[in-house]
């Protein structure tokens, strides 16, 4: 698939190639990493990027994502950060109006008749574009695994390429956008390119009372999915006022990489603030693409409820191992109350 600039004008297109949303849980290569809070499965791309600013789509460097970008002159910009705060474009505060009100008569596509969807943003005289490039080598801990890129926040619409290949498109500014880079990534000399447009059809929805910025304003990172991976995690604790007992209700979605592999194992442990495991359960992982494991257990002893006077926290640890007993991934969540 090729990128299409007209996606900016079409409210029916707000993501292309974007992975499904999931829980925001940290992943680690083993239990020791989880204890230290440093993961070998994650690589930050924050820092200095190559950058070119254009006032609209017509004047942007169209082939900037290619290694031989022609005559494009790149400057340096720091990521994360808004483009306006780096000296480009203008800072603009809006309360109740759209940022173009009083200048351009613009309404959402398809609301005023056929044909009015075309060109509202892609052909606008003023709709700034930021063209970002980042060169990187893949960290050792991510090699040989499925590699995902996570943009924590990009305002407002972005196109992504890796090594000259189109990867995807997304519009949601304030939630993470993830894409699978595995088919195109190399161990060394990767070229990541991101084209950010200030406005798209998402501007009709993201119309809150705040300053209007654009750019890669939150962190960007790569993370690896090992043989067994916690894809999604839902956990909810319950507290019984009558008897002081606590119950943990959890659903854990596990994905498996590769077909025909031997079964693995998942260990779940709920610990108190002293590290004592109060609840432990193990389950066999089958070699299917995805499986969701459910857990609902009541602790045998009374729990300490959280309060503003005693902010007591419990820790949920999930450890995945392969058929040889080697840890492939560890997840540690320390905010259960």
What are the language-model segments listed below?
Residues 129, 187, 245, 286-291:
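Solvent-exposed, conformationally flexible loop/turn segments
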Residues 227-256:
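Surface beta-strand/loop "capping" patches
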Residues 3-15, 19-21, 27, 35-36, ...:
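Accessory beta-strand-rich segments of carbohydrate-active enzymes
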Residues 142-145, 185-189, 299-313:
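Short glycine/proline/serine/threonine-rich loop/turn segments at secondary-structure transition edges
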